[in-house]
UniProtKB/Swiss-Prot annotation:
Signal peptide: none
EC main group: oxidoreductase
Record NCBIfam families: argC_other
Family stated for the protein in its record: Belongs to the NAGSA dehydrogenase family. Type 2 subfamily.
A cellular component annotation (GO) from this entry: cytoplasm
Reactions mediated catalytically: N-acetyl-L-glutamate 5-semialdehyde + phosphate + NADP(+) = N-acetyl-L-glutamyl 5-phosphate + NADPH + H(+)
Active site: 116
Name of protein: N-acetyl-gamma-glutamyl-phosphate reductase
EC identifiers of the protein: 1.2.1.38
PANTHER family, alphabetized: N-ACETYL-GAMMA-GLUTAMYL-PHOSPHATE REDUCTASE, CHLOROPLASTIC-RELATED, N-ACETYL-GAMMA-GLUTAMYL-PHOSPHATE REDUCTASE, CHLOROPLASTIC-RELATED-RELATED
GO biological process: L-arginine biosynthetic process
Pathway annotation: Amino-acid biosynthesis; L-arginine biosynthesis; N(2)-acetyl-L-ornithine from L-glutamate: step 3/4
InterPro entries: AGPR_type-2 (IPR010136), NAD(P)-bd_dom_sf (IPR036291), NAGSA_dehydrogenase (IPR050085), Semialdehyde_DH_NAD-bd (IPR000534)
Amino acid sequence: MKPKIFIDGEHGTTGLQIRALLAERGDLEIISIPTERRKETAARAEFLNAADIAILCLPDDAAKESVSLITNDTTKVIDASTAHRVAEGWAYGFAEMDKEQAKAIATAKRVANPGCWPQGPIATLRPLVTSGLLPADFPITVNGISGYSGGGRPMIEDYVAKGEDASEFLPYGLTLQHKHVPELRAYAKLSHDPIMQPAVGNFAQGMITVVPLQLGGLDSVPTGAELHAAIADHFAAIKGGVVEVAPYAHLERMPEIDPEIYNGTNRMKVYVFANDKRAQALLLAVYDNLGKGASGAAVQNMDLMLGL
């Protein structure tokens, strides 16, 4: 018997991407609600409970409702919304976050797919906090830019309609209430809420996250090489991971980084830039906001949960 996969919300941006990634998978059976029954709660409940894994690509409240409709103890859930990312009983679906995280996902019945914005900063900050190079109360700011697909269908339609007239750089989240802050704080092991100041660019997908560090106030100031080594050692210990750390020796010669280099993949690349004389560093991560940042991570988590 092939595992049955139900994508609740398969017609949204993330749902469509997941459906496309699974289209050629002969080892799975994708089940879908007939078009005429899509708005029926009873139909959703029927398909949720018929699935081996239900992938929820819904707004937070709708995702919570879907979970409440599941009465089949064998149905596993991957939730792509923010509803359960720091909830008790849910495994966080960033498999490379820790060397035991893939196992935690594989054995979980409930997995919260990460948001696109926190994954890069978690990848760069968590190894530094756990190694003691950065204190948990270090003041953190996250900057970056992503493709407009991160804003969902309304933003996609707006950017496509405007074409070359669309904004090249559009900051948002200016109220300092970004919905991804709680998971970033929790999984980067920070003791205070970081500032998250994202922006959207006039390109469809791909993203760069940037964490600038002013290190001069620390009692023991780490060098760039020490920061890089801690991050590189962290990911070297994770077997089968999809996060690559750029060699430190190459970084002096890199004038720029393209946010679209990993589009269409589930990979991430991490960079550490530093000026030791100024006690400053930049932690960068590049990945596809629709890949490792959303649908690619969901499929990776699904495979772990199925033992594939």
